[in-house]
Amino acid sequence: MIHIIILHITLSRPTAKIGAINLKKYDSTKIKNIAIAGQAGSGKTSLTEALLYKSGATDRLGKITDGNTVSDYTPDEIKRKCSVYTSLSSLETGEFKVNLLDTPGMFDYEGEAVEGIAASGCVLITVSGKSGVRVGTHKAYDLAKEMGKPTMFVVTKLDDDNANFNNVLTQLKAEFGPTVCPVVVPVIADRKIVSYVNLIEMKAYKYEDGKAVETDMPTAEVSEKMGYRIDGLIEAVSEAVAETDEALFEKFFSGEAFTQKELTDGIHSGMNSGIITPVTCVSSTDLSGVDMLLKEIDLLLPPPSEKDAMIGETADGEAVEVACVESDPMSAFVFKTVADPFVGKMSYIKVFSGKLIPNKEVVNATTGSTEKVGKLVTLQGKKQIDVAEAGCGDIVVAMKMNVNTNDTICDSTRVVKFAPMTFPKPCYKMAVRAKKQGDESKISAAMTRLMEEDLTIDYKLDPSTNEMILSTLGGLHLDSVVGRLAGTFGVEVETSVPKISYRETIRKKVKVQGRHKKQSGGHGQYGDVWIEFEPCVSDDLVFEEKVFGGAVPKNFFPAVEKGLQESVKKGVLAGFPVVGLKAILVDGSYHPVDSSEMAFKMAASIAYKEGMRQAEPVLLEPIGSLSVFVPDDNTGDMMGELNKRRGRVLGMNPAEKKGMTEIVAEVPMAEMADFTLLLRQMTQGQGVFTFEKARYEPLPANLVADVIAKNAVAD
């Protein structure tokens, strides 16, 4: 048994005056930037609310059900009762200013989570004590690790009768490996939390009137009923700390006990290096355990000053290290944008070095332009508080500044650019049209603003169908964008499944005549052409002339070609553009008075229609290349689904991510309208895919009649 020397640390926190935190200047060693991420519904916003209230940063404990939380304040969030956007708030614990970035857990809003985690120095991943580890838990953890962020699991909702901390802890260890290290655990009797054990202090605390009071440690009998031995967990903490430092390793195996400072410093170091992921627990409703979490934030989580130097790129493309040093030239990164039509653009900025000062000119290293820094504010949810400057390591919002998400701004004495964040690509596509005629320009202007704000949406014209296509990450994301258009920009739109850009072509060579003759007094109209039509591999019309003896004067050749170019925009089957068509003008006749360019254009159009009918026209459908990643357990289901969608599976490969398989296939685009939603449902959000148009193939005969009926055009 390892004996640990216990140094008592009081649990009471200095209470900050409401808003006082925003008036102080914080050194980079005294700032902590924390993203709160995890599965939707796992308690992220409630935890944010509890931390703010318990620290004294707010004077009331908001509730999601009441729509009065600090971080979920937009109409969309209040209506949905979940986070849609990453919000910024701050508190003070000990000597530290803590910036909290409450991120959405819904997969449709993953872009917001990317921004929040990118700006953070550490990620608290909430795990419901009732639901346990879910797909969103893995997504948050994977995002954090991809960006090199230390992580801590916070088990929430332990006041629920169906919560089971032991099951969750077992899941965490199984899913995330030996780095998982509990530091605070609940003592549960009759499905109720009676106290919490701080494994670092080796003390138990119960809560009376919201205050922690030291109580007896649980007996061995109680520990066994809970499913975990307290003494075993305490020893596991020491074992984890021993792995962080050679001197600690030697001390551990010599049988010496660690001091409490050695334990906290060791966990702190282990978090920085990624070999320790602490697990703690709270109840955000009665606030039990929240004061312990505040202390863990104080003692365990790293400030920006401890982070390795950022690697940037100079104007010459050379790598440069940028350390978090306030005396160095300023450099900062725009990680989020809010497009507010009333207050203007709000740019969320993380300062990496130096100081960001209002009204000072800086270089936008991404665009090369010079910009003036706008007014700086910090946020407490929607509340804005002016700040005089922002030191390195801090997060602020610049008002009305001409910069965009992923831009780097810096001092002209050291121009440096940081790598942009990588966002998931929007794959859920819907056609959008204005409800009111004449609002099209308003939609375009509003979407331009929204695309500045959200890099996971796209809005552009599909020239093949002449529809405006809005691409998002899913149905909820689409609803949010449509809601913003109406609520924020006053433009109502309708959405529909995008049209499929079918094409038409021919299968055999024919020779036809096109003759246009009209006499109505005075000059008439006369144009006569013989044209050979044959299949070819070009997407565009291929036009040639092989006229001998001047049967058609050369000056009318362009008119014939123009008539054909206009005609191939609509096929004879269902009005789709024609591809793979070669036209050779071989003969014809003309009238010295009545022939004109217009007459020969008409003659070419007549020849085209007759030639298409005789040349066995067929419909072509677009085929896309699909690369879809699914959990190994879903491989069979996905193969069956692709077969239902007329897909051709080309191969399967083990993915880089353990437990995932890549399936490569070709699938008709007409079968992919709901694939985003199907994949999310099948894989509980774990699946991802890319899909790009590859080529056209003949539409199966059994589907032709239906497509023609829906798209038939008048002769």
Model-derived regions: residue spans:
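Structural and coupling elements of P-loop NTPases
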Residues: H3-T10, T15-D715
